Amino acid sequence: EISCSLVGSEMCIRDRDMGRVRLSLPKALKKYMEETYQIHENFLYLENKIFRGMDQIKQLRIYPPEKGSCKIIVVYEVPDQEELPQNGHELSIDLGLHNLMTCYDSENGKTFILGRKYLELERYFHKEIARVQAQWYGQQSGKGVKYLATSKHIRKLYKRKHDSVTDYLHKVTRYLAEYCREQGITCVVTGDIRNIRREKDLGHRTNQKFHSLPYNRIYIMLEYKLKRYGIRFIKQEESYTSQCSPLSPEVGKRYAEPSKRKERGLYRDGNRTYNADAVGAYNILRKYHSVSGVKRELSVTGLKTPEIIKVAV
């Protein structure tokens, strides 16, 4: 088997309107195609709608076919976008286990939840991998195999899991970037939980779930998607944001009351009840304003019932 990496614009001619590229094939790949597939061509034509939006293609990596389809990785250049002038319209994000991203819009006080299917995907693949592993290892043990090895099926399941999760994270972060562009948001502030992951002990089962969540990948995907629209991306240290009332004078240890964060994702403050993750997103933005020296009134009216946005898996 051979994989091919085509570098440079001289090897790639594009018809941008049609979403088609024509590739000049290197000798080694032409020989491989002739001997393996009896294909005698000097050029390879690829047509896909994704090529329409691409600027200068820098590299194409083509991998051998599996079950009738090829894997192609395209590396292309995107021109730098100048950061937009700050207009005071911001979005804050609280990252969590069951609600992957809970968002707060500073202009209208709207809150919404993205990424609920993530945990469902993780659970499905964990169960399926565990089931197949138990069967496979049982078969090997029955045959007296001393050193148990993994199987092709298990490796493919891990790959499917990785690809499915990556695809879903791209869809969720793309939805968020498009929302910000359409609404005229110029700054996105997300809670920075990297230190929390290292330092907190939340119990064995919660630790296991919490430490497996791909927050770094979410940060990277969000940052480059927002950057394309000139939207500023900030990671804000988020201590006490989930424990302080949205009505407290400030977000900090002095006003933290963990007992007010109740079961089923609720935060109770006297006779007022809010969604706990929405409170977290709201307080992350308050904390960012505090450390930035910004004084701005924010609405708490949308903290009770966030809208749940469904993104197709």
Where are the language model's segments positioned?
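Structural motif
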Residues: 3-4, 52, 83, 180
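Positively charged, helix-rich recognition surfaces that bind polyanionic ligands
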Residues: 66-313
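Single conserved hydrophobic/aromatic residue that forms the stacking wall/gate
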Residues: 1-13
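Polybasic low-complexity intrinsically disordered regions
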Residues: 14-89, 93-99, 105
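Intrinsically disordered, low-complexity serine/threonine-rich segments
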Residues: 6-8, 27, 295, 302
